[in-house]
Amino acid sequence: GCPHCGNNLSNAETEIFNMLSTLNPIQRERTILDGKEIDIYLPSHKLGIEYHGLRWHTDFFGGKGRTYHLSKLNDCLYKGVNLIQIFEDEYMNNREIVLNKISHIVGLDNAKPKIFARKCVVHEITKDEAKEFLNRNHIQGFASASLYLGLKYEGSLIAVMTFLEESEGYWNLNRFATEITHNCIGAGGKLFKYFIR
């Protein structure tokens, strides 16, 4: 929904809009942010979705300034609207992950099989196991860490949480992802509790 890109939605925006059609989304909403456009808006969820094409949103092509997207995010938060920002490269490289995450946020994934964390077991897993899982299920893919934890259900890995020890005694939760084909209820809490112990 960029004025430089023409009046048509991009293929990605159209796909996202169509996926959300049962929730009555609004295209190019301009009233909430006093004239600034939100590409796709879901009034029932107070949720906006912005799709940022890389070419037209770079300074080189006369696009947005460095703080434009942050400013729009802050404007949305001030108005009580959560904003999902999707960059073209993320969508093109991780389309299935992006669509699954949006579907989960708005509650369209209720048909997915549910797995409850209480029926699962936490294991320390190998770097290779974490890498394969995160590259398939996390928008940013794998990142090296100091500790790799996996949640397994009947022997299958359904969630991964990784931690990086920045300095002695100071840990950073580096990555968390669940299997995108399932709803893994309570997975984050169970993995984090294991880490704290």
Language-model-derived ranges and their functions:
Residues 155-166, 171-172:
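Conserved beta-strand in the GNAT
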Residues 133, 150-156:
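Compact, aliphatic and Gly/Pro-tolerant "microcore" segments centered on a short helix or tight beta-hairpin
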Residues 2-147, 171-177, 182-197:
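Nucleic-acid endo/exonuclease domains
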Residues 147-150, 160:
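Short hydrophobic/aromatic beta-strand element in the GNAT-like acyltransferase core
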Residues 42, 151-153, 165:
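Conserved hydrophobic "DFG−1" position in protein kinase catalytic cores
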